[in-house]
Amino acid sequence: MLSEKTIEIVKSTVPLLQEKGVEITTRFYEILFSEHPELLNIFNHTNQKKGRQQQALANAVYAAATYIDNLEAIIPVVKQIGHKHRSLGIKAEHYPIVGTCLLRAIKEVAGAPDEVLNAWGEAYGVIADAFISIEAEMYEEAAHKEGGWKDFRNFVVVKKVKESDVITSFYLKPEDGGKVSSFIPGQYVTVQINIEGETYTHNRQYSLSDAPGKEYYRISVKKEKGVDTPDGKVSNYLHDHVKEGDMLPVSAPAGDFVLNMDSTLPVVLISGGVGITPMMSMLNTLIEQDSKRNVCFVHAAINSNTHAMKEHVEAVDNEYEQVKAYTCYSAPTEKDLEMKNFDKEGFVEREWLQTIIPTTEAEFYFCGPVPFMKHINAVLTDLGVKQEHIHYEFFGPAASLQ
């Protein structure tokens, strides 16, 4: 239990964290990887280079300071981060290392006096204990489920399917021939990649793109091509070099962006680009479980060349009366225009969305590029959708949709 004095000191640093949070977390990662380079086998190098992880950590530290007198308020965030940590294999022994490096960064960047550093040291201990406790439960749950396991398990690529010009699916079965654990639609796995010539292992988290209950897991990966940045190292490696019969270490499913199976409300699934992957798991689960809930499936893509799983969604739309699917192309091809195989040209605008969603009294799930998600979140909020019915997933470190 933290003393009132400690709480007061930590809360007094909130303005400082608001101003210098990213500077502190940037320095923190420099210290961490300089002194513990083995941790580069866990963290996403691309997110480091683009500053995403630094921003996400700064947001988390700021929230911890703000709610240090009521940590229950940030337990949902702790659980969300905990899912990622468990999926990546972060353990209790990593927390003291992180704490030491974080305090050094606060001292170096902010020139914090000993009183502040001591208070933050105490606060970090309490916060770390919360993470360790929650993550320990997650490790136990993942390991003790039927077909479950701890850390990483070798899977074989039994099938590789090109879904569009940019997205390819990988069907994965356990190398040991055992069962795979069930999961909740919307969850993801971490795939571990060792690229020849690279010093460190690469970990990437991919949504499971089919319903649970199969003998395999399916992930569907976009080949990331950079415009002003390098191409996605791991996604390009998977597309170009990983073939059927190859082996990939995979973590047990994790994540809290999940379909609410207890709700009876209609479901609206909105995706942009590769954000379609968790939506496919949700859609397939609803139809395979013979759910009577109305489903509105909205997908935005550049055109039919980049549109993955198009034929499958159209088949579901035709076969199941309760499912209505809509497609929006920002730059349709001449063939698209001739075939009229989409519903709207341009973007998913408020006026159009309002005409196709059955009701605002529904469970809304969306995923895609961050600008797309910010727009959808603003539209749904403007339409009066209740916050508890708005669910979304970031592909990468959490960011703000405001």
Swiss-Prot record:
The chain positions of domain Globin read 1-136
Q: Which reaction does it catalyse?
A: 2 nitric oxide + NADPH + 2 O2 = 2 nitrate + NADP(+) + H(+); 2 nitric oxide + NADH + 2 O2 = 2 nitrate + NAD(+) + H(+)
Domain named FAD-binding FR-type is located at 150-260
The residues annotated as site (Influences the redox potential of the prosthetic heme and FAD groups) are 84, 393
GO molecular function terms here?
Answer: FAD binding; heme binding; metal ion binding; nitric oxide dioxygenase NAD(P)H activity; oxygen binding; oxygen carrier activity
Protein origin, superkingdom: Bacteria
Matches recorded under InterPro entries:
Cbr1-like_FAD-bd_dom, FAD-bd_FR_type, Flavoprot_Pyr_Nucl_cyt_Rdtase, FNR_nucleotide-bd, Globin, Globin-like_sf, Globin/Proto, Hmp
Which segments carry the region annotation Reductase?
147-402
UniProt cofactor(s): heme b; FAD
Protein name per Swiss-Prot or TrEMBL: Flavohemoprotein
Q: Which organism is it from?
A: Bacillus thuringiensis subsp. konkukian (strain 97-27)
Gene3D superfamilies given in the database record: Globins (1.10.490.10), Nucleotide-binding domain of ferredoxin-NADP reductase (FNR) module (3.40.50.80), Translation factors (2.40.30.10)
A biological process from GO: nitric oxide catabolic process
Which residues are listed for FAD binding in this entry? 188, 204-207, 394-397
Q: Where is the active site?
A: 95 (charge relay system), 135 (charge relay system)
Q: Give the protein's function.
A: Is involved in NO detoxification in an aerobic process, termed nitric oxide dioxygenase (NOD) reaction that utilizes O(2) and NAD(P)H to convert NO to nitrate, which protects the bacterium from various noxious nitrogen compounds. Therefore, plays a central role in the inducible response to nitrosative stress.
| Record site: Involved in heme-bound ligand stabilization and O-O bond activation | 29
- Give the family this protein belongs to, as stated in its UniProt record: Belongs to the globin family. Two-domain flavohemoproteins subfamily. In the C-terminal section; belongs to the flavoprotein pyridine nucleotide cytochrome reductase family.
Q: Where does heme b bind?
A: 85
The alphabetical list of record keywords is: Detoxification, FAD, Flavoprotein, Heme, Iron, Metal-binding, NAD, NADP, Oxidoreductase, Oxygen transport, Transport
Provide the residue positions that the database annotates as binding NADP(+). Answer: 273-278
Instruction: Give the main EC class.
Output: oxidoreductase
PROSITE patterns with a match to the protein in the record: FAD_FR, GLOBIN
Cofactor binding, note field: Binds 1 heme b (iron(II)-protoporphyrin IX) group per subunit. Binds 1 FAD per subunit.
Q: Give the domain section of the comments.
A: Consists of two distinct domains; an N-terminal heme-containing oxygen-binding domain and a C-terminal reductase domain with binding sites for FAD and NAD(P)H.
